[in-house]
């Protein structure tokens, strides 16, 4: 069988080094031939050995205009990188593909905050093909994959069920329209800009902006609690302090305390803030609102799922996106 291919550069989706990715398409006359010859996994492996090359094709699921296309893990990674470019990730981070292969087909996607054992098991039971999480499954280098450990069991289950796992971590935190922007918008901040910026590298971690009108700190805290759907939060500062400008950082924001103190914001909203951070803010006449790590980041699940649905539909792929609805904050308040 002879297949003719044409390459079309997708300039909107660069890879890590900024080089445009190529999207390989089969010319019209050969589409039906390629569709009839799609190999299963074993035949694909044999083809690799026999021909010393492997080609992944995204072809329409049926001939004719307007038909949806089958998606692969690689296709979804390209979509995720338009939302949260990989090059934005911090050097210490391990965002990207955690388990699986780019050529694996994807018909169902799960979105979750954490790759916890119960999340991975549920995704497998629901026949998901791709699990997209904020926090990486493999954060530190693994010396071995031991199925007697929690992470080993998750890797084993994912591979056994052919569930790919992809993380969008600090790149989603930093990206424009990403997690920090989502948090700032949710609590009502306007005129949003970067809190910890680097020249030529986008807005960086954290955001800062204005409230529509000044409010008392106690009223701001109650507003945040309501808008974020929280049972509780921690507040530092004079409850009557007038707040007109607010800084935020999702997750653990302690590393941005210096940027907060250097700014003109009266309050800083984040999670995992420490005792001495609280004392420093108290002494400086500033305010802290600690909404917890989970509380500041869980909103990414619904938001990212919706972005994925929009991009999948826009590109003509056929893949369902579901949100994991069972996650809970690991901290319990008595």
Regions found by a protein language model. Name each.
Residues 3, 23, 30-33:
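Cationic, amphipathic, low-complexity segments that mediate targeting or membrane/lipid association
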Residues 4-12:
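Hydrophobic, low-acid, alpha-helix-prone terminal segments
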Residues 5, 53-54:
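Aromatic (phenylalanine/tyrosine) cluster motif
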Residues 34, 55-57:
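Cysteine-centered motifs
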Residues 57-334:
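Hydrophobic structural segments
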């Amino acid at each position: 069988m002879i297949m003719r291919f044409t390459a079309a550069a997708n300039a909107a989706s660069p890879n890590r080094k900024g080089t445009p990715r190529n999207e390989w398409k089969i010319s019209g006359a050969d589409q039906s031939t390629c569709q009839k010859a799609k190999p299963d996994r074993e035949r694909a492996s044999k083809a690799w050995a026999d021909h010393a090359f492997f080609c992944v094709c995204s072809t329409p699921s049926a001939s004719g205009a307007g038909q949806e296309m089958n998606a692969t893990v690689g296709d979804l990674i390209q979509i995720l990188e338009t939302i949260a470019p990989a090059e934005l990730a911090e050097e210490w981070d391990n965002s990207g593909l955690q388990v699986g292969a780019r050529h694996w087909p994807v018909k169902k996607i799960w979105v979750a905050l954490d790759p916890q054992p119960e999340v991975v098991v549920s995704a497998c039971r629901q026949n998901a093909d791709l699990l997209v999480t904020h926090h990486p499954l493999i954060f530190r280098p693994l010396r071995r994959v031991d199925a007697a450990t929690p992470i080993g069991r998750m890797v084993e289950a994912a591979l056994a069920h052919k569930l790919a796992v992809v993380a969008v971590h600090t790149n989603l935190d930093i990206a424009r329209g990403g997690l920090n922007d989502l948090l700032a918008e949710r609590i009502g901040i306007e005129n949003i800009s970067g809190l910890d910026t680097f020249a030529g590298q986008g807005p960086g971690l954290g955001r800062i902006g204005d409230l529509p009108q000044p409010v008392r700190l106690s009223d701001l805290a109650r507003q945040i609690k309501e808008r974020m759907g929280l049972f509780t939060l921690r507040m530092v500062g004079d409850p009557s302090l007038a707040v007109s400008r607010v800084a935020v950082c999702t997750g653990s924001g302690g590393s941005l305390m210096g940027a907060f103190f250097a700014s003109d914001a009266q309050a800083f909203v984040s999670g995992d803030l420490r005792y001495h951070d609280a004392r420093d803010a108290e002494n400086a006449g500033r305010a802290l609102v600690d909404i917890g790590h989970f509380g500041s980041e869980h909103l990414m699940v619904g938001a990212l799922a919706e972005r994925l649905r929009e991009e999948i539909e826009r590109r003509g792929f056929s893949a369902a996106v579901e949100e994991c609805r069972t996650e809970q904050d690991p901290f319990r308040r008595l």
